[in-house]
């Protein structure tokens, strides 16, 4: 096992232009490219001179090829008790009309359009309508506060903003339109038009000189054809989650993105035309862009738009119900979703109630998946669980298990091997390559493959400084890890997840992996805190599985013993506390930085992406009970 993968991977690195030119044959082009790769100025432009349209590849192509009556999109909203289905022809027709609205309001190729929407079909329709015109969409996660929305509007300078009147949470309605109005007031840049989708749960007040009603406008608008764009023209700008200060807008091109999306579906996710693809994420994040919207539709799959949660809508069976009801073939979600399910249903009783025969595989990404969670999902679903590692900046998997190219043996804790085009290396702090098993900084030797960021919007200096300057000739991922003797990648965490305990560099991610093995632990986080004697020491936060009523002190002692047993006394892991939940962003990333800020008594910079600020307050009380911050009495 491994010959096909090894040969393919080697070809992609030795002759990237020939490799990706072959892959690009799966995409429809109006005109082929003049050059496969232009790597001048530190920017990597793929398929230079090529002319195509992303929306055409996602919708019209399937209609023209006789698949217009196949289901393209299923909308399932437990929070509104709504279900809808669209064929490829129906979706194409709606997208064409909405593109007509944009065109009638003056939106042309190269204009930016900010999209501020909940998880409803209209969010995807808005994105595809922009792509149809060659306009550059910038999706902002629905429910972001006005200040965060304003910073993105100010940076992208959109001609139009597309929004909905509201978003629906488990037990509340978030009124989007007042947030949007406040955000625009804060901006020096003013959009000429706001297109508003009115939802029955909340009808927004409209400003007649600026706002137009989407539904009414769509009824009277004729559809427009796709506009040919250059492969190197931007498809979208996506601002990285948790941004503080000025936002960082990742630019994705049209051509390279389309080629990589097609390649990944054909070779990694083993998804064919007609398959049902369920990505439980949000279009506000990169996973949603790539694997709710573009990749499934480009490959002729049926994509599911889910407006709900893994739990509480109404219970931990949500994913399993959808898999049975729609005969889902591939499930893709973040590890945190499965941890939430595991916490409420540790024995998997809900899973047993549903038929999962249609499901072939489960993919997880967005954060490191601990071995215990991976094994739990695998054991109860009896399906292969595939971890994959990537970033907003790359747009698709740096490391994964290419199921249809050649499935590799799964090693728990590893997202398997680097994907073609990603020349992954482990470097020390001086930029020297390290050997097998040596822990260091994960970097990608240039050039980057198609779909990776073209740069940062309107800030080339920030792009170079943040990704290219530290190790010339390499792209800095910002993650640490190692590659074992078999070529398997292990991601230990962000560079700031390495702590220095009495001169020993230790990974908090490795400690989390060990703690997660404890039978009572649902999920955990480890941070480094300042210590007068050792410089830094680790502090653990533990969330227990539902129904665990054992004494917390005994559980903490057991966890401490586990870390000592696996790493040794050198870890100095002695401080831990049980909490009801971990603070997270809405995309499921644990806010370890905020935990450390509270433990060290430094200024707390809470991101706008936080899911529940009350969880942070509860953790602060737990930290105080441990006697931290140590300098509290001095302030």
Name what the model sees in each region.
Residues 55-56, 69, 73-128, 145-150, ...:
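Conserved AMP-binding/adenylate-forming core of the ANL superfamily
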Residues 1-86, 90-93, 97-100, 184-190, ...:
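N-lobe entry segment of adenylate-forming
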Residues 140-166, 180, 324, 331, ...:
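AMP-binding/adenylate-forming catalytic core of the ANL superfamily
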């Amino acid at each position: 096992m491994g010959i096909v993968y090894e040969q393919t991977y080697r070809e992609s690195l030795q002759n990237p232009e020939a490799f990706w030119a072959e892959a690009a044959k799966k995409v429809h082009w109006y005109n082929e490219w003049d050059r496969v790769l232009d790597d001048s100025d530190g920017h990597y432009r793929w398929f230079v001179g090529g002319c195509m349209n992303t929306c055409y590849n996602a919708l019209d192509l399937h209609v023209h090829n006789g698949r217009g009556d196949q289901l393209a999109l299923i909308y399932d909203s437990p929070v509104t008790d709504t279900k809808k289905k669209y064929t490829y022809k129906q979706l194409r027709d709606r997208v064409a009309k909405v593109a007509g609205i944009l065109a009638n309001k003056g939106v042309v190729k190269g204009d930016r359009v900010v999209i501020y929407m909940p998880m409803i079909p209209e969010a995807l329709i808005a994105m595809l309508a922009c792509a149809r015109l060659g306009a550059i969409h910038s999706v902002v996660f629905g429910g972001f506060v006005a200040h965060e929305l304003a910073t993105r509007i100010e940076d992208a300078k959109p001609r139009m903003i597309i929004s909905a009147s509201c978003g629906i949470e488990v037990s509340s309605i978030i009124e989007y339109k007042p947030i949007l109005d406040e955000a625009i007031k804060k901006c020096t840049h003013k959009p000429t038009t706001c297109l508003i989708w009115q939802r029955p749960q909340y009808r927004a007040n409209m400003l007649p000189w600026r706002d137009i009603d989407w539904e009414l406008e769509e009824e009277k608008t004729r559809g427009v054809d796709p506009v040919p764009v250059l492969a190197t023209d931007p498809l979208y700008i996506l601002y990285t989650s948790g941004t503080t200060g000025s936002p960082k807008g990742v630019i994705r091109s049209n051509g390279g993105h389309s080629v990589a999306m097609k390649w990944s579906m054909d070779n990694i996710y083993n998804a064919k035309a007609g398959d049902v693809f369920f990505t439980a994420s949000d279009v506000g994040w990169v996973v949603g862009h790539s694997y709710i919207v573009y990749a499934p539709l480009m490959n002729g799959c049926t994509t599911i738009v889910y407006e709900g949660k893994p739990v509480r809508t109404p219970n931990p069976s949500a994913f399993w119900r959808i898999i049975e009801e729609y005969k889902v073939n591939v499930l893709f979600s973040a590890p945190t979703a499965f941890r939430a399910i595991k916490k409420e249903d540790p024995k998997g009783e809900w899973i047993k109630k549903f038929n999962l025969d249609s499901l072939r595989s489960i993919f997880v990404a967005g954060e490191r998946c601990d071995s215990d969670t991976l094994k739990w999902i695998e054991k109860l679903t009896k399906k292969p669980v595939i971890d994959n590692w990537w970033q907003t900046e790359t747009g698709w998997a740096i490391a994964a298990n290419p199921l249809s190219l050649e499935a590799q043996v799964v090693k728990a804790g590893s997202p398997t091997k680097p994907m073609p085009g990603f020349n992954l290396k482990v470097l020390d702090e001086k930029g020297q390559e390290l050997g097998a098993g040596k822990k260091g900084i994960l970097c990608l030797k240039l050039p980057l493959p198609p779909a990776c960021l073209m740069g940062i919007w309107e800030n080339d200096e920030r792009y170079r400084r943040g990704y290219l300057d530290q190790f010339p000739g390499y792209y800095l991922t910002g993650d640490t890890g190692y590659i074992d003797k078999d070529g398997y990648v292990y991601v230990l965490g962000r560079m700031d997840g390495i702590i220095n305990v009495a001169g020993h560099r230790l990974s908090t991610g490795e400690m989390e992996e060990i703690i997660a093995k404890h039978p009572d632990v649902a999920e955990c986080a480890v941070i480094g805190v300042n210590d007068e004697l050792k410089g830094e020491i680790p502090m653990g936060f533990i969330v227990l599985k539902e129904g665990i009523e054992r004494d917390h002190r005994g559980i903490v002692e057991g966890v401490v013993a586990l870390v000592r047993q696996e790493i040794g006394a050198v870890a100095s892991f002695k401080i831990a506390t049980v909490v009801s939940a971990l603070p997270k962003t809405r995309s499921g990333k644990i806010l370890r930085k905020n935990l450390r800020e509270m433990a060290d008594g430094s200024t707390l910079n809470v991101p706008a992406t936080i899911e529940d600020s009350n969880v942070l307050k509860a953790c602060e009380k737990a930290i105080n009970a441990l006697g931290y911050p140590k300098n509290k009495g001095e302030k």
